[in-house]
């Protein structure tokens, strides 16, 4: 209260000591002066106090700034409070469109896939690929592994053989000390899989790690893994201090943390058909297949192309990961690391033609969860999970991988046939019209006009201006 009193006193004096015009816009000099002042205790302010401070400190029209923030608040106070408590210093909700891509056949089962994304044409491309492959046997998927990783990083300056002997006696103590943390996970069939001592001193002086593998079943497992790792670190330090073979401060734990690189948590997704089945209007099946293979080969050897190639895959993956309440940043980091595992960044997808059978596939690491986190808190995440039939983590891995493969197929198909802009810009047309503040009649006329014309921003501007003049 004392702080708030001082803060309010500062605001009052500030308004008294500065001249403002009668318009809602602050004079430039005043805004510049207030922008240079820091604030302490911001997190302790109420939500209303936070947004008032932001509006009056950073915006030339505070009333408008407040109005925009509040326009996106939910009318249901309990639902808004739920969103407010997801993160810190929440001031409003940031909307992304939630779309769906129907008609995905995965292992002979039909799915409608939820996709949360702001980029136009992604959902349409996924839907188109789903229909294309649905008529050709659908997508086939296999989970190749679900092992997740965490590490205790530490330094050791003593004799390596002493450390190796010490670790052999330490390992069972690490597991027993973490028993209270792993009991419930073990009842469900998960838990600690392996703990290995890794010598990294050739890469960095005195650097060692405990490299630990876990099975977390339907949980993404971040909290479980990190809790186990911190217990391992505590046990490691305690046992080293009590071992006469170690000198004081000879072993020092640096940090304990899970890894988002999970090369043993892999899912494979693929499609295949006879090359003749790839034929469509004005497209020869074999020619298309051979050109498609060449496009994949280019992305395999050329990092500049591979980055954009894989970004397109992640358009599909991220959209489903986000819609299902999973951590898309973790997935992105792990997938891109996997794409560079050979030492050069390369394509995540592969293609082949064998005995006239075209096969297109991808193997990627996906550490996902269907319990915990936002999966049971966010109403739209729960809705998305039910839309998918409340899948297990293994099933969700397969669905997400298929979304990425479908997206990549659609993109490479467009690139090697009509070009990417034709389809993308038609989907982007509505965004351009909204930027130009087109009314419903103008939108309808413009959409009709560009059904047979190439869509560019300048062409749309010219057409709208012609309508209005």
Each language-model region and where it sits:
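Conserved phosphate/anionic-ligand binding catalytic regions in large, soluble enzymes, centered on
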Residues: 98-125, 217-225, 300-325, 404-411, ...
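Acidic/polar, glycine-rich intrinsically disordered N-terminal extensions of enzymes
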Residues: 33-111, 115, 119, 139, ...
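Glycine-rich, mobile lid/loop segments that gate access to catalytic sites or pores
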Residues: 148-300
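Conserved alpha/beta core surface patches that mediate binding of polyanionic ligands
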Residues: 84-96, 127-139, 176-202
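Catalytic-core signal marking the mid-to-C-terminal active-site face
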Residues: 365-469
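A structural-propensity feature for long, helix-poor, extended segments
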Residues: 139-168, 339-401
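Glycine-rich anion/phosphate-binding loop at the beta-strand->alpha-helix junction
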Residues: 225-237, 245-246, 251-380
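Flexible, glycine/charged-enriched surface loops at secondary-structure junctions
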Residues: 138-144, 181-194, 239-260, 328-334, ...
């Amino acid at each position: 209260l004392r702080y708030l009193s001082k803060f309010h006193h500062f605001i009052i004096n500030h308004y008294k000591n500065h001249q403002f015009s009668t318009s809602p816009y602050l004079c430039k000099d005043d805004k510049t002066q207030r922008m240079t002042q820091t604030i302490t205790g911001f997190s302790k302010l109420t939500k209303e106090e936070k947004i008032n401070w932001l509006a009056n400190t950073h915006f030339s029209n505070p009333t408008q700034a407040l109005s925009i923030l509040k326009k996106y608040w939910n009318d249901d106070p309990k639902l808004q409070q739920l969103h407010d408590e997801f993160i810190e210093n929440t001031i409003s909700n940031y909307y992304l469109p939630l779309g769906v891509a129907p008609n995905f056949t995965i292992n002979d089962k039909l799915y409608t896939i939820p996709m949360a994304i702001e980029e136009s044409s992604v959902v349409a491309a996924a839907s188109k690929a789903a229909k294309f492959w649905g008529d050709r046997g659908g997508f086939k998927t296999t989970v190749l592994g679900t092992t997740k990783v965490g590490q205790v990083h530490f330094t050791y300056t003593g004799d390596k053989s002493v450390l190796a002997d010490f670790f052999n006696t330490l390992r069972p103590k690490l597991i027993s000390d973490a028993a209270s943390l792993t009991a419930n996970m073990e009842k469900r069939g998960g838990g600690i899989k392996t703990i290995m001592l890794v010598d990294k001193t050739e890469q960095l002086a005195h650097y060692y790690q405990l490299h630990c593998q876990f099975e977390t079943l339907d949980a993404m497992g971040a909290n479980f893994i990190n809790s186990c790792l911190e217990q391992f670190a505590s046990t490691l330090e305690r046992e080293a201090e009590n071992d006469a073979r170690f000198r004081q401060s000879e072993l020092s734990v640096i940090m304990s943390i899970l890894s988002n690189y999970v090369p043993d948590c892999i899912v494979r997704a693929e499609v295949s058909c006879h090359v003749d089945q790839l034929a469509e209007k004005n497209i020869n099946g074999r020619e298309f297949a051979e050109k498609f293979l060449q496009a994949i080969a280019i992305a395999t050897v050329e990092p500049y192309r591979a980055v954009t190639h894989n970004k397109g895959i992640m358009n599909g993956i991220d959209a489903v990961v986000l819609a299902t309440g999973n951590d898309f940043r973790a997935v992105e980091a792990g997938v891109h690391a996997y794409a560079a595992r050979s030492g050069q960044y390369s394509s995540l997808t592969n293609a082949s033609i064998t005995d006239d059978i075209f096969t297109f596939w991808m193997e990627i690491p996906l550490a996902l969860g269907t319990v915990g986190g936002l999966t049971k808190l966010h109403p739209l995440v729960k809705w998305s999970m039910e839309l998918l039939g409340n899948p297990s983590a293994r099933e969700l891995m397969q669905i997400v991988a298929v979304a990425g493969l479908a997206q990549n197929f659609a993109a490479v198909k467009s690139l090697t046939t009509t070009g990417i802009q034709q389809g993308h810009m038609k989907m982007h047309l509505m965004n351009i019209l909204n930027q130009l503040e087109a009314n419903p009649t103008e939108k309808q006329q413009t959409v009709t006009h560009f059904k047979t014309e190439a869509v560019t921003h300048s062409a749309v501007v010219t057409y709208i201006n012609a309508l209005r003049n």
